[in-house]
Amino acid sequence: MINWKVELSYIGKDFWGFQKQPGKRTVQGELEKVLKLLFDEDIKVIGAGRTDAGVHALGQVVNFKTKESKNFSCDKLYKVLNKLLPGDIKIKKVEIVDDNFHARYSAKRRWYIYVIYNNEEKNLFLRDYCWWINKPLDKDLLNLSANLFKGIHDFRNFCVIENYDNTNVEIYESFWYFKEDLLIYFVSAPFFLRKMVRFIVGSMVEVGLKKKELEDLEKYLKDRKEERFSSPAPASGLYLFKIDY
């Protein structure tokens, strides 16, 4: 068996997420459809991050195994995949890796970014790629909020609850980068719970708009609550940035 590792990017707005779903257009589904055509076998694609509907990726990583190479070099497969895949998926790199490499379980750190366009006037060309907020955000409060999330916390109040054995997550990096009207949040961790980054961003925006207090956000991180601190931020601003192995 040959184990292929592929790095790719995609625009998430017309996908029902990464993971294959019956009757839905997904990134995994598009990849597997083209790979079956090329290798003449059913192939299961494994993704490092299972992005939700509308979420983009700049550095998603997948792996899949084939019985034979079908005379595909890494360079040739890179070119053919980019030719056959739809225009909202771009292959960035193709490698052959050790048999034990697993895109999801071998990952050491996942990075996400979230993009906010903070301007009174809307920008139609950014609409599907960010969260437009037309009221001014307090950047100092955003920075202070981001610092609260560093370290190990129970994120039960900041995710969609599924059958998780453990909702404790260690956040390695949590910071904002500001460039004029673009406010970009960077966050990294070994893994994330479902919609966790979007709930984190939504909560920071509540503080940044001065709708809620920074001290209240700190309490939510320490104590389990029945109600949410905020709604999740829209999917359009979220990007799977890169995966560290």
UniProtKB/Swiss-Prot annotation:
Its job: Formation of pseudouridine at positions 38, 39 and 40 in the anticodon stem and loop of transfer RNAs.
Membership in a protein family: Belongs to the tRNA pseudouridine synthase TruA family.
One GO term of the biological process aspect: tRNA pseudouridine synthesis
Binding residues for substrate: Y112
TM regions (residue ranges): none
Domain of life: Bacteria
A molecular-function term among this protein's GO annotations: RNA binding
Catalytic activity: uridine(38/39/40) in tRNA = pseudouridine(38/39/40) in tRNA
Catalytic residues in the record: D52
Classification via SUPFAM superfamilies: Pseudouridine synthase
CDD domains named in the record: PseudoU_synth_EcTruA
EC number: 5.4.99.12
Quaternary state and interactors: Homodimer.
Organism, as annotated: Dictyoglomus thermophilum (strain ATCC 35947 / DSM 3960 / H-6-12)
Protein name: tRNA pseudouridine synthase A
Keyword Transmembrane helix among UniProt keywords: no
Keyword field: Isomerase, tRNA processing
PANTHER family: PSEUDOURIDYLATE SYNTHASE, TRNA PSEUDOURIDINE SYNTHASE-LIKE 1
HAMAP family: TruA
Keyword tRNA processing carried by entry: yes
